[in-house]
Amino acid sequence: MSKVIEINHPLILHKLAILRDEKTGSKDFRKLVEEISMLMAYEVTRDLNTEEVEVKTPVAVTKCKMLSGKKMAVVPILRAGLGMVDGVLNLIPAAKVGHIGLYRDEKTLQPVEYFCKMPQDIAERDIIVVDPMLATGGSAIDALTMLKNRGAKNLKLMCLVGAPEGIEAIKKAHDDVDIYLASIDEKLNEHGYIVPGLGDAGDRLFGTK
């Protein structure tokens, strides 16, 4: 059963408040998304495996812990997910980066993949899928399905803000994927926007409309 983890660290809450403000421009918005993503990644990676190693310091030989087990990958959902990548890489610089681009066919409402580029060994990696907004959950569900179809098994979803509707949709479709959020917001409005949300994260990141 998937877990839903709301990371309410004071630094995240402070930065998220500035991020939400409609007066925050694209330059500051990008920086805040990166900073919050790095802080969240600390919690998302809390359960990574470690092994004991011997290290010689300038003073003595000692036992230390280092990461062991699977390599990692971060996979942004285009385009807004790109804003979260550097924050994760600041903490996990050795992680590989894959990209997933999706849109929905207006007639069939089915997901259409327009771009997908993954590390060759993606099936063997622990994967963090990143997207600032978890609204209906449709894009995240499709992205997780695509990764599973490529053999991925250990997946986590990291979003800045999410609506209860999207969270429930993910839990129903992918009950083996844990969901990490900086905030669980109130609801979706009639246009499918998260309330209070951030507005359109992609437009605010890249200065487009």
Curated annotation (Swiss-Prot):
Uracil binds at residues 194, 199-201. It catalyses: UMP + diphosphate = 5-phospho-alpha-D-ribose 1-diphosphate + uracil. Its cofactor is Mg(2+). Allosterically activated by GTP. Binds 1 Mg(2+) ion per subunit. The magnesium is bound as Mg-PRPP. This is Uracil phosphoribosyltransferase. Pathway: Pyrimidine metabolism; UMP biosynthesis via salvage pathway; UMP from uracil: step 1/1. It comes from Clostridium beijerinckii (strain ATCC 51743 / NCIMB 8052). Catalyzes the conversion of uracil and 5-phospho-alpha-D-ribose 1-diphosphate (PRPP) to UMP and diphosphate. Belongs to the UPRTase family. InterPro entries: PRibTrfase_dom, PRTase-like, Upp_B, UPRTase/APRTase, Ura_phspho_trans.
